[in-house]
Design a protein with these regions (language model features):
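Arg/Lys-rich, alpha-helical DNA-contact motif
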Residues: 75-109
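Canonical helix-turn-helix DNA-binding module
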Residues: 26-57
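C-terminal regulatory/oligomerization modules of transcriptional regulators
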Residues: 97-127
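N-terminal positioning helix adjacent to the helix-turn-helix/winged-helix DNA-binding module
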Residues: 6-9, 25, 66, 77, ...
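Basic, amphipathic "hinge/linker" alpha-helix immediately C-terminal to the N-terminal HTH DNA-binding motif
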Residues: 59-77
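DNA-binding alpha-helical recognition surfaces that contact promoter or target DNA
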Residues: 12, 42, 97
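N-terminal helix-turn-helix DNA-binding core of bacterial DNA-binding proteins
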Residues: 2-35
Length: 127
């Protein structure tokens, strides 16, 4: 099953909310993403069908191993681009919005090369 940017956003949001709150329900996702509850219900159903997400008997959402790996990958990219754009002087709100777009379109190879370059430069500055 192909996972689109919106699905990745839902997984990332569930990861973030789980870290902040411990337990996550659809209503929490709806509030955090400012989307309707029916939109969340549809996304949850699609993500469950794809094996990215599970819901327990109390309607709490849980990332599967597959979903967690994708969510962490997207979240890492998001933090990386947000932090570096802010460091470059971009307004934090703009940096956040741009990071959300960049995180979905950049290839794994390009992201890893950028990350290596920034880590290398950061280590060299410390010398």
């Amino acid at each position: 099953m192909k996972l689109y940017a919106s699905g990745e956003d839902y997984l990332e949001t569930i990861l973030i909310l789980h870290r902040e709150m411990g337990m996550v329900r659809s209503v929490d996702v709806s509030r955090h993403m400012a989307v309707s509850k029916p939109s969340v219900c549809h996304a949850v159903a699609v993500l469950q069908e794809g094996g990215f997400l599970a819901m327990d008997g109390d309607h709490f959402l849980h990332l599967t191993e597959r979903g967690r790996i994708i969510a962490e990958k997207i979240y890492e990219r998001h933090r990386f681009f947000t932090d570096h754009l802010i460091e470059a002087g971009v307004d934090p709100k703009t940096a956040e919005a741009d990071a959300y777009r960049i995180e979905h379109v950049i290839s794994d190879e390009t992201f890893h090369r950028l990350k290596e370059k920034y880590q290398s430069e950061s280590e060299n500055k410390g010398l």
